[in-house]
């Protein structure tokens, strides 16, 4: 047993021959086929004397000339041709090839570079110098040529010539990379005065902030602090409004901070905050904040942060004063800061920005400014009279004829409740119901009176509620539930009876369900059956039938359990076993009412949707599997429809497949219709044959005549 579980390579269990055998002949054939597909290398040519060499050169030159004849302007062929001539040590011919192409097109830098590199490789420095000179004269805007030219002179140690080339290049005002190369060249030679002169030209040609900062860093590396400071000041004056960039001021302030000039740095930061547009000063504020954290006190840091945020919010408000999200953020910051008067001032400014139209979608955010204002006065400033005034002014401002907000009425009433002004709170709720009654207001008012125990007032409110909104199912159900909890079952039943008689309920199924559940809790089973019958008269829905069936079966099940308990109490445990065996024989009698309702439902739904009929049959099948026998189950299985796949047009010129169900009673009618269709097709085919024969006879008669 354990030997088969040891590690290592597993043994072959099946040692019989494989069904397909591979022979050596097959292996050789495949290898030969693969070998034939490989590309064959050209044969090596061995040159033994000068005559063969000249012949080889002649053929090679003829090949290149033939290529050039077909591709006269292709630079790559000329470069390869010249490289081959160079490999043959025939530089004259190589130069001739390059010159031929340059006569055709001198605007390709690669050809000039290859030409000059060939001369440099063969140590023809003067020739290379002439080529570079010609190239930069013809193509002065190609930086690569200048770089190569200066690099050659630099490598040769000919620094005056390299400097002269740089000067010629700078006259063309090239990109910053060229100036940086010139600066590195002079710094490498430690000619710092020359470097300063180059920087002075550089900042005029490219008057960018990066250029000025690079100039200051150069002076700083040399230890000329005053010169660096002067350059910063020159940059701010020279650039003017263009110099109002945070990076220049940050670099200047960090420079002063580095050399312990803290007050200078602080002045620079404050000057920058006043002059740099705040939309471009994010890093400036962050850097200033970090600076104050290192060198300032807590008050200074907080002032910096608050000043930054205030300015940002004010800028946003200038752009769009109707952007209420900005107002919310601004007010939240001021509330945290704790300045009551400042916060109150901003609240007054914010509520002055009325929405553009009297549409509720524009007021939804705006109304929260008033709500937050009232809560601020109540909870933070503790000014109750001002809070009451805010609520009152807000209610006056809302166009109640067009729309209203339940939330503001409820908050106002709750505020008065917290001030123990119950009469005032009732008055507010009454005004809300009179102006624009809504479910939330009724619910809150009713909840208040329930908490106070004024049930007569609650009944009055529910009556008013249902008078205004008779289609509100929740109101009917809550009213009936209240009466049930108070023990007034007759009142509750009457309310439900009135509710189900309403023609336009928004969710009638909720009322029926609560009515039925209420009567089940009261154990009025006969009345529940009557309710189900009434509901089925209104709607012949499969879910109602299934609910009715489950209810009837649950009653019978409870009655059966009661009988068993009584028998156990009377006869004892020994006789219980016998009785239980007898109960199995009476299952059919107990389940008979449930089965009868299934049959009734099946007949009632015969003209309904097939999906609903199938749902009922599936429920019936589960019932018979659990409580029935094989005979009753087979009767249900015979009624189960057959699912088939059909096709129909999807309305867009296409065909879609869908599932359909064919019930057993429909199969007979379907078969009859199919037979009629087949007979019609046979008759049509016979008629076509007869017409064809007549046409053939007519054609024969015409031919004979």
From Swiss-Prot:
* Start-end of each HAT repeat: 55-87, 89-121, 123-155, 157-188, 190-221, 223-258, 260-294, 304-336, 338-372, 382-418, 420-451, 453-485, 487-521, 523-554, 597-629
Stretches for region Disordered = 559-591
- Give the CC-aspect GO terms: nuclear speck; nucleus; post-mRNA release spliceosomal complex; Prp19 complex; spliceosomal complex; U2-type catalytic step 2 spliceosome
Q: What is its main location?
A: nucleus
Q: What is a single Pfam family found in this protein's UniProt entry?
A: HAT_Syf1_CNRKL1_C
One GO biological process term: spliceosomal complex assembly
The keyword Glycoprotein appears for this protein = no
Q: Does the keyword Transcription apply?
A: no
One GO MF term attached to the UniProt entry: RNA binding
Q: The organism sits in which domain of life? A: Eukaryota
Q: Keywords for this entry? A: mRNA processing, mRNA splicing, Nucleus, Repeat, Spliceosome
Recorded hits in InterPro entries, A to Z, give: HAT, HAT_Syf1_CNRKL1_C, Syf1-like, TPR-like_helical_dom_sf
Tell where it localizes.
Nucleus; Nucleus speckle
SMART domains given in the database record: HAT
Protein family: Belongs to the crooked-neck family.
Q: How does it assemble?
A: Identified in the spliceosome C complex.
Which purpose does this protein serve, as stated in its record?
Answer: Involved in pre-mRNA splicing process.
This protein's name: Crooked neck-like protein 1
Q: Which organism is it from?
A: Dictyostelium discoideum (Social amoeba)
Its taxonomic path starts at: Eukaryota, Amoebozoa, Evosea, Eumycetozoa, Dictyostelia
């Amino acid at each position: 047993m354990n030997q088969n579980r040891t590690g290592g390579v597993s043994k072959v269990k099946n040692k019989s021959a494989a069904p397909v055998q591979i022979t050596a002949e097959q292996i050789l054939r495949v290898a030969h086929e693969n070998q034939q597909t490989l590309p064959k290398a050209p044969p090596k040519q061995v040159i033994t004397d000068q005559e063969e060499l000249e012949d080889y050169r002649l053929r090679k030159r003829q090949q290149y000339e033939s290529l050039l004849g077909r591709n006269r302007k292709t630079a790559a062929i000329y470069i390869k041709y010249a490289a081959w001539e160079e490999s043959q040590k025939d530089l004259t011919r190589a130069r001739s090839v390059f010159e031929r192409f340059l006569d055709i097109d001198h605007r390709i830098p690669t050809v000039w570079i290859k030409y000059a590199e060939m001369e440099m490789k063969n140590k023809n420095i003067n020739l290379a110098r002439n080529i570079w000179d010609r190239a930069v004269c013809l193509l002065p805007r190609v930086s690569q040529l200048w770089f190569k030219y200066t690099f050659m002179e630099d490598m040769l140690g000919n620094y005056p010539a390299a400097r002269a080339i740089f000067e010629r290049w700078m006259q063309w005002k090239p990109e910053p990379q060229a100036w940086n190369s010139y600066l590195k060249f002079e710094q490498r030679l430690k000619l710092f005065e020359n470097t300063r002169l180059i920087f002075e030209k550089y900042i005029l040609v490219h008057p960018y902030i990066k250029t000025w900062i690079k100039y200051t860093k150069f002076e700083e590396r040399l230890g000329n602090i005053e010169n660096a400071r002067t350059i910063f000041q020159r940059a701010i004056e020279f650039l003017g409004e263009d110099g109002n960039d945070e990076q220049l001021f940050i670099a200047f302030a960090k420079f002063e901070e580095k050399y312990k000039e803290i007050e200078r740095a602080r002045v620079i930061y404050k000057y920058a905050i006043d002059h740099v547009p705040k939309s471009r000063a994010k890093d400036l504020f962050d850097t200033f904040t970090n600076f104050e954290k290192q060198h300032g006190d807590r008050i200074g840091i907080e002032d910096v942060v608050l000043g930054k945020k205030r300015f940002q919010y004010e800028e946003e408000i200038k752009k769009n004063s109707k952007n209420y999200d900005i107002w919310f953020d601004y007010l939240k910051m001021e509330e945290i800061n704790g300045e009551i008067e400042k916060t109150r001032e901003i609240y007054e400014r914010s509520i002055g920005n009325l929405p553009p139209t009297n549409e509720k979608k524009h007021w939804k955010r705006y109304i929260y400014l008033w709500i937050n204002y009232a809560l601020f006065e109540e909870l933070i400033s503790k000014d109750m009279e001002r809070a009451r005034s805010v609520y009152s002014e807000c209610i006056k401002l809302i166009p109640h004829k067009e729309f209203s907000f339940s939330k503001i009425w409820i908050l106002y009433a709750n505020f008065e409740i917290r001030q123990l002004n119950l009469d005032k709170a009732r008055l507010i709720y009454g005004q809300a119901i009179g102006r624009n009654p809504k479910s939330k207001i009724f619910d809150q008012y009713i909840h208040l009176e329930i908490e106070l125990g004024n049930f007569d007032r609650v009944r009055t409110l529910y009556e008013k509620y249902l008078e205004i909104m008779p289609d509100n199912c929740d109101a009917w159900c809550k009213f009936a539930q209240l009466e049930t909890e108070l023990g007034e079952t007759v009142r509750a039943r009457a309310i439900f009876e009135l509710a189900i008689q309403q023609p336009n309920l928004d969710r009638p199924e909720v009322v029926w369900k609560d009515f039925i559940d209420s009567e089940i809790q009261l154990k009025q089973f006969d009345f529940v059956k009557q309710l189900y019958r009434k509901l089925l008269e209104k709607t012949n829905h499969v879910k109602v039938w299934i609910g009715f069936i489950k209810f009837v079966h649950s009653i019978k099940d409870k009655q059966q359990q009661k009988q068993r308990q009584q028998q156990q109490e009377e006869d004892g445990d020994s006789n219980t076993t016998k009785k239980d065996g007898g109960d199995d024989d009476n299952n059919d009698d107990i389940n008979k009412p449930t089965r009868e309702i299934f049959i009734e439902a099946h007949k009632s739904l015969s003209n309904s949707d097939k999906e609903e009929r199938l749902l009922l049959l599936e429920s019936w099948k589960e019932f018979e599997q659990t409580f029935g026998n094989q005979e009753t189950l087979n009767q249900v299985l015979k009624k189960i429809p057959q699912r088939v796949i059909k096709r129909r047009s999807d309305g867009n010129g296409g065909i879609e497949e869908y599932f359909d169900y064919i019930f057993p009673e429909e199969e007979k009618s379907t078969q009859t219709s199919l037979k009629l269709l087949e007979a019609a097709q046979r008759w049509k085919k016979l008629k076509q044959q007869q017409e064809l024969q007549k046409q053939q006879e007519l054609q024969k008669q015409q031919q004979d005549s």
